[in-house]
Amino acid sequence: MARLGKILLFLLGVVFLLDLQVRFPERSDLKHPPRLHADEAVQWSLAKDAAGGVPYSINEDKFHGPALAVATRGVFAARGLAFDDATVADLRQIPFYFFVLLCAVPLCLTGVAWPMRLLAALLLWRVAAGCYFGEYFIQETLLVAGFVWGVLLWLRSADEGRPAWWAGFAGMAFGLALACKVTSAAYLGLFALALVWCARDTLTWRRTAWAAAGALGVGVALQTSLFTDGQGLVAWGHQFVRSFAVASGNADTLPLTNPGYWVAVGVWLALLVVARLLRRGPRSSADAPLVTAVGCFLFHLALPYKTPWLLFLPVCLSLTMVWPLLAEGAWWSRAAGFAGATAFSLVSVANLEEHTATEAHIENLPEVVSAYRADWQAAHPERLFYVAIDGGHYWPLPYYLRAFQVGYGDFPAAARAPVRFLVRTDASAPQVPGYRTYSLLLREGERYWVLLDDSVPLKKSACSPLN
């Protein structure tokens, strides 16, 4: 029977690898160049401003810390790459590095056979934890990678009888998560409760002190942009206080719009709990990841603020650590665990409602504006060419217009700009003397009127986003 189990696992691995080879090109940027999502454009802008000497804390980011900006500045400095020259692929490389670290977590599990570790890592890599945003230029991938590694390092340092100071490495990983988003403080509280219930013996004063020191060291360093922005700690405090208003539904509440994904995650976690109960045995530190994942899910389920990105942590905890540990044992247990994790990942992909994508033709906007600028400056060599954007949720326009001087809002020279972007609220095009009006679809449900100085004709092409 054991031999049959090995053969079955081998066949599962072969099927998986073949699928990987067939489908991997579908994720290639060469076939479908990626478009920057609005939230990614916000993070790009904040990181660019920070690189230009603007303290991150003055941006009043309501949700996130500067961890992504610090990491991006470091990588771009090492590569000699300027923010204005960065492509979407360049930006997404930053969270990709952390996603690779996340995929490596199953390989570091103890008490799990190597074939199962490898299958778990490959499954996570292949389906991106059932989430399309694992490679996005956002904070969530850094947060989840830091937190999951913190859980792993804490458990390994305790289970292997290492000195107390090894817990400091877990704290450092948690510090990364804390500098990404204040919600990490709640996650840490849930993990502490899980340890109290499952593995209280690991919570010694010395280990806790070392973990706290590591978290404070890395968290403060990142939150202050490597100790150059002392107000970053104050900003984190403001975000923490504000988080209670968000949690209570009194500020920035997002209602549930994708129940299918939440149901899929809830059923998956419930099945893992049932599997753990069927295994019986006393509670141990190996149960802490499952308890933490369930706690995080229930935490967000109880609060009015709902977005699928909030489930990235419990999903990754379950796929990196929980199911491989529960599946270890007989061949049928391993096969059932792998099949269940694969099925959940595929169901997640099918049920997860994707964001409102930026229209593909926006990639051609810089080329169109650049050609118009050349003609306009030839006709008006003594005047300054600039773009004015007034109103609306205009992201990701700043990224695609980064080669031009752009002003936002109602500034004195906005009405005289050679190129003006106005929010389109109805089908009646504005008639402004001295301008020709075009329509621009930024993304579904979001259109702009683009006004161009009529002293210079626009050379339109078939791929122009202006209609």
Task: Give the ranges of each region predicted by the language model.
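Membrane-interface transmembrane helices that cradle and orient dolichyl/undecaprenyl
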Residues: V112, G150-A167, A177, V196, ...
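Transmembrane-lumen/periplasm boundary regions of multi-pass, lipid-linked membrane glycan transferases
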Residues: H32, L36, V42-G53, H64, ...
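Short periplasmic/luminal acceptor-recognition loop of GT-C membrane glycosyltransferases, typified by
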Residues: F63, P366-A415, F421
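Short hydrophobic/aromatic helix or loop-helix immediately within or flanking a transmembrane segment
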Residues: E60-F83, Q93-Y97
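Transmembrane-helix signature of polytopic, membrane-embedded enzymes
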Residues: K6, P106-V127, V144-A145
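Specific aromatic-rich, kink-prone transmembrane helix
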Residues: L142-D159, A170-F174, A293, L317-M321
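Short acidic/glycine- and proline-prone juxtamembrane loop motifs at membrane-interface regions
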Residues: V88-L91, A129-L142, V182-T183, T307-P308
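Transmembrane-helix motifs of polytopic, lipid-linked glycan transferases
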Residues: Q93-P115, W149
